[in-house]
Amino acid sequence: MKTKTSLQIQWIQTSAWLPTLVGLALGAASAASALAEPATDNRAPEVPTEIAVSNDNKVHFHGFGVGVQIYTWNGSSWGTAVPEAILFHAEGVVAIHFAGPTWQSKSGSTVVGALPPKAVTVDPNAIPWLRLDAKSPEGPGIFANTTFIQRVNTTGGKAPSADGAFVGHVARVPYTADYFFYRQTSN
């Protein structure tokens, strides 16, 4: 009897919220058209110096993320967000993004971003742009040998401005972003 790998299990668990995210993706399609094309554009984005990546690293994968930032009310403020998102590329859905922060590809690779990230607020109505150092990239595929991850061109995703109704109240706030994954170049 064949057993499921952790990647297969994660993708199965994702199926519960995937339809919602696909709906969000369709709504975000017009916003995505104004941004770089993930399928063909592996140029590094123009970013503030606080989140720039050194020149000895090059973009090897660029995906468009659509999902939610999940906040929980602790009685006095909204707690740190946990993402649930999918990443799109020319071939369609290529990866999922979840707590860690972790990205897991259909090709079998996984990368976790080191916390805390370098962050800069570009749009006061959206979650910050980030640069994360990659830790523990695993498996063959698009996230293999990743050194840095950037989240840029963000829309939405900010914690609600109103207080939660009760301790434990959960708010799922839609967001979109471009994600750039870097590898070190050999010189």
Across the structure, where does each feature detected by a protein language model lie?
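N-terminal secretory signal peptides that target proteins for export/translocation
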Residues: 1-13
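Bacterial N-terminal signal peptides
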Residues: 19-29
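Sec/Tat signal peptide C-region and signal peptidase I cleavage site
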Residues: 32-36
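Primary mode marks residue(s) on the alpha4-beta5-alpha5 output face of response regulator receiver
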Residues: 37-69, 76-187
